Amino acid sequence: MVSMQISLSLVGLLDGSNGGSAVDATVKNLAQLRDEGFRRVWMAQLPYDPDLLTILACAFHEVDTIQVGSGVLPIQVQHPTQLAQRALTLNAIAGGRFSLGIGMSHRMVTEQMWGISYEKPLRRMREYLDGLLPLLAGQAADAVGETVTTRGALQIPGAPTPDVYIAALGPQMLRLAGRRTAGTLTWMTGPKTLAEHVGPTLREAAAEAGRPETAVRVAASLPVAVTDDIAAARARAAEEFAIYGQLPSYRAMLDREGYAGPEDAAIIGDENTVSERLDELAAAGVDEFAAVTFDPSPEGRARTRALLLTRDK
């Protein structure tokens, strides 16, 4: 059996739907998942939620051991210097347990909500890394770009450098991730696409840059429900994740896989069925699988987490 780390991707903690504060909910959930045996979780920064890194600063101070990654932070709304400053400060609090996932968000968000052009995404990400990566490594940045310029250095002694992941799906962004970062974070991407497109593109770029294949990782995320009511779970997945079938970047991944919608990408079934689907992902070259549990009942989510823990390698 090919080894694959199992993590969780948490959604809904920051939006107030839990009925309490986002900080309290995050601390409670991270402590529970740590005690259950999970080593890492990923948390998204949605455009209308409270600030993820601020909440994680509180949570890391209260909860030990467990690792947390941002999955992902959009780069357009903060300068590389500001993000490096925040990420290093957070990782100092976390004692090196933080991973920084960044991405381009989506045109409908950047242009309609923020009034920021989505043009030249590859150039924007490359120039952003030109400033961000030296600063995270404790070096001075001197990067003059068309979309962003970063100069200067930070003084945050003792802060560990966080791993940086890109939410890379297209070939050029995957190549950039392979050359310069710890890897890619994928969503709504199935095993065939991961095996034939994502993994090879990422690792070939790493090799061309003189990096070992082990320097980059594929961290894939999909909805998961261990259940005996497959029809109900598929209907819920189709409704809850409908927006992702409409966003161009994820729609392209669903089309590559031959999926009609997010309900086809979701991993649904009893313990044996879900375990077989996880085997497919591991065989496809996935290094880490971050599950989004979406069963509406606490019992159903607990059943799913129990199965996931048996698969963590």
Predicted regions and their residues:
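Active-site-adjacent structural elements that line small-molecule/cofactor binding pockets in enzymes
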Residues: 1-313
